[in-house]
Amino acid sequence: MTVTGPEADHAERFFAGLPGRVVFPVKASFSGTAVPVAGDVVPFVAGVSAASPGEEMLGLYDPLGRAVAFLANDGHRVEISRGPAADLAGFRGAAPVDAGPVSLARILSGAPGYAVAGAEAARYEDGAWWLSDGRQTLRSDPGRRFLAGAEYRVPGMRVTVDYPGRESADPPERIVLSVRGVTFTLRRDAE
């Protein structure tokens, strides 16, 4: 159900405040699996290092620690490069993505990837809020305490992100990302 007036304003302020909960620099490591549409489960490890939302690096590695791919985000464009183990993992490479001012570290920390402004709000039957501003659609938990999932629309693709089992506003322990037919399941390593 679409919401207007004070509830819509409250929903927008709630989602707009979530990126501020992520304190930079961000450093985190993950273990997980990638499942292509037609293929075997591929285990991997990953790490993110971000000095700021405009200076981020995400590395994907095989289970032996050999680099498969790197994503470098300058706050406007995500460059994707192959690592030495790319061929062994079946990664052929990808063109750069003009994603705009997105933050990969915020997404992996359980916050919206883009700043929130001027959006349409709605409420699900369970009480969760939904907010869409063109580039992203965000969904809260029913108690409206944290981000439960999101969909991002970047040129040439849609990226869906879910945080299954999330119970607090702390960085999520588990993240499921789907992009271009590949589902990545990440588990945040203990710090």
Protein language model regions, located:
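Hydrophobic residues embedded in beta-strands of well-ordered beta-sheets
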Residues: 55-56, 76-79, 129, 145-147
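Gly/Pro-enriched, hydrophobic low-complexity segments
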Residues: 118-191
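N-terminal leader/targeting segments and the immediate start of mature chains
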Residues: 1-50, 54, 65, 191
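A mature extracytoplasmic/lumenal domain signature
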Residues: 60-64, 73-77, 82-84, 165, ...
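Acidic/charged, solvent-exposed loop-and-adjacent secondary-structure segments enriched in E/D, K/R, S/T
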Residues: 79-115
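A short, polar/proline- and glycine-enriched secondary-structure boundary/capping micro-motif
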Residues: 67-73, 90-94, 159-161, 184-187
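Hydrophobic lipid-interacting interfaces of membrane-associated proteins
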Residues: 31-37, 63-66, 81-85, 136, ...
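Structural motif
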Residues: 51-52, 74, 125
